Amino acid sequence: MAVEHSAHYERMSLEEYLALVEQDPEHAYEYLDGRVYMMTGGSPDHSIIGSNLNGLLQAFLRGRRCIVYNSDVYVQLSDHYRACPDATVSCDPRDRGAQEVIRYPSLVAEVLSPTTEARDRGQKSLQYRSCPSIQEYLLISSEFPLVEVFRREKQGFWSLYTLGPGDTIELSSLGLRFPVADVYQNASFLEEANE
């Protein structure tokens, strides 16, 4: 999710966290094992990349049983973890009609920012990969064209595919392929490199 705000919160119980979310619906708060992180908007490139990815997913999945969500929707990973990925896909009928929380995502993606990258690669990555419904997890750089696709294989282990300019992203859980360049269309760092 976007960028961590400077607000610092002491450890909270789940009940205290839920009360905070209810009291302040204008902000998103991630809850990671008792620690609360207020999330705010990221850089323009972060927004462009997230919008591009969500648009690609939405266009492909239109009319199918899967739903694409942006970072406005929480993903509940357990009683101790609630995150706001930049893109989430759920194909599970139990998530249809969910108002605020998705519990059975098949794919999640995080657009990395300097303030959240360590958490996205560490604690959240472990939680995403321990969620039985998640088949693919993407980490997308917001500073240069680099996409990492973590894929759950049939044997239960995870494979990592690191992709750059000229490569094609394959999301096998959805049957979707698209160029890395499509995710980065209109990103300012690409335009600056071409000037």
Regions found by a protein language model. Give the residues of each.
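Gly/Pro/Ser/Thr-rich low-complexity, intrinsically disordered segments predominantly at protein N-termini
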Residues: 1-195
